[in-house]
Amino acid sequence: MPSIEFDDSKPSWADQVEEEGDEGSLPSPKETVKGNIKTVTEYKIDDDGQKFKIIRTFKIETRKASKAVARRKNWKKFGNSEYDAPGPNVATTTVSDDVFMTFISSKEDLNAQDQDEDPMNKLKGQKIVSCRICKGDHWTTRCPYKDTLGPMQKELAEQLGLSTGEKEKAAEPEPAQPVQNKTGKYVPPSLRDGGTRRGESMQPNRRADDNATIRVTNLSEDTRETDLQELFRPFGSISRIYLAKDKNTGQSKGFAFISFHRREDAARAIAGVSGFGYDHLILNVEWAKPSNN
């Protein structure tokens, strides 16, 4: 009879599983709770027929929930989870941390950002435009008091008997009328009024206009001379404006020439208006090439 030797060492859990049941049977999962630590032990068999043990450790936290959440937790389970224990089943439910959403931007922040990106707001401090009605930093067509102050100013001008155009004409000095020859005798051109003056093309003012003339391109077809007057008037006194128009339609060809009395005013107009958005188009302003005439 062979002798039997007893091993005092602790047996492995795999041997215990084999001794507890037949081959292929697994013990039921065990769950132990010690304080706020819950340990769940499960046994499974892999594809190769090997048995292995899974131990999951959970930390129990007590949280206050609303009454509606507490009632939902007491609902009776159904389907394949009808006989599950209270709480989530690790086989069918994945428990993750709560995600709290933080809204960084709001409508006010978006509106403020849009105002910062608006080129009109960037140009307000430069005083390149001035409303004819309220003298504000915006276009006359966008004046909020256009429907109220505009008619009042027009009525006041009519009561005074002067329109806007008549006021400008009254402020301008009338040109000196040439002295007419009352005797009826023939006067040579050299002795007539203005005969000693040089021709208009020889005048230094014409050359000064060429030096203070700028060229504006990428204008819309609906642009008028009054629009250009309103756009460039804040930079200085304008001597003349030439807007190229189509002979048949009368619409703008997309470019114009503006002459200032001072070259410094023309330089400020180039710096202020070049690259400026007007009537959904980006204006291009540069020095005009001097004429050969």
From Swiss-Prot:
Pfam families: eIF3g, RRM_1. SUPFAM superfamilies: RNA-binding domain, RBD (SSF54928). It is found in: Cytoplasm. Residues 1-32, 163-206 are annotated as: Disordered. GO terms for cellular component: eukaryotic 43S preinitiation complex; eukaryotic 48S preinitiation complex; eukaryotic translation initiation factor 3 complex. GO terms for biological process: formation of cytoplasmic translation initiation complex; translational initiation. Residues 194-206 have a biased composition (Basic and acidic residues). InterPro entries: eIF3_g, eIF3g_N, eIF3G_RRM, Nucleotide-bd_a/b_plait_sf, RBD_domain_sf, RRM_dom. It comes from the Eukaryota. RNA-binding component of the eukaryotic translation initiation factor 3 (eIF-3) complex, which is involved in protein synthesis of a specialized repertoire of mRNAs and, together with other initiation factors, stimulates binding of mRNA and methionyl-tRNAi to the 40S ribosome. The eIF-3 complex specifically targets and initiates translation of a subset of mRNAs involved in cell proliferation. This subunit can bind 18S rRNA. Belongs to the eIF-3 subunit G family. This is Eukaryotic translation initiation factor 3 subunit G. The gene is eif3g.
